[in-house]
């Protein structure tokens, strides 16, 4: 009976080792986290009578489940930072493609700073504007 148990254990060890190697060989999963609801607010608060409004649909790219959990746990801080950034913009920084790319890069930088402050790692690899409407 003992021999049978030892034999079964011996046969199951290689299977467990192969399964562990498969887990180690897997590439971490890339996740896109959409910050919902979309950002809507005013920008260009320079004293002109015309109200300027933006709507931004933002997604964050992270790798791995731990990074996804960290971003979701800190989403209110990220949203606060992005709302403040969008509100600081002027008509010039929202009106052309190059300026929008600079805004995207600054939003990514600030998001990474929030995550570094909270978790010790930037975690967010990229920030994407799925939609950016200005009026």
Specify the residue positions occupied by each region the protein language model found.
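Flexible, low-complexity charged segments
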Residues: 1-135
């Amino acid at each position: 009976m003992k021999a049978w148990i030892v034999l079964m254990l011996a046969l199951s060890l290689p299977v467990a080792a192969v399964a562990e190697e498969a887990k180690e060989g897997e590439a971490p999963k890339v996740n896109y986290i959409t910050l919902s609801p979309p950002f809507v607010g005013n920008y260009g608060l320079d004293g002109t009578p015309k109200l300027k409004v933006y709507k931004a649909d933002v997604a964050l790219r992270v790798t791995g489940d731990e990074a996804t959990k960290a971003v979701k746990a800190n989403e209110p801080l990220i949203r606060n930072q992005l709302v403040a950034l969008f509100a600081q913009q002027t008509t010039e920084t929202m009106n052309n493609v190059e300026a929008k790319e600079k805004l995207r890069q600054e939003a990514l930088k600030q998001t990474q700073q929030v995550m570094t402050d909270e978790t010790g790692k930037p975690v967010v690899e990229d920030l994407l504007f799925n939609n950016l409407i200005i009026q």
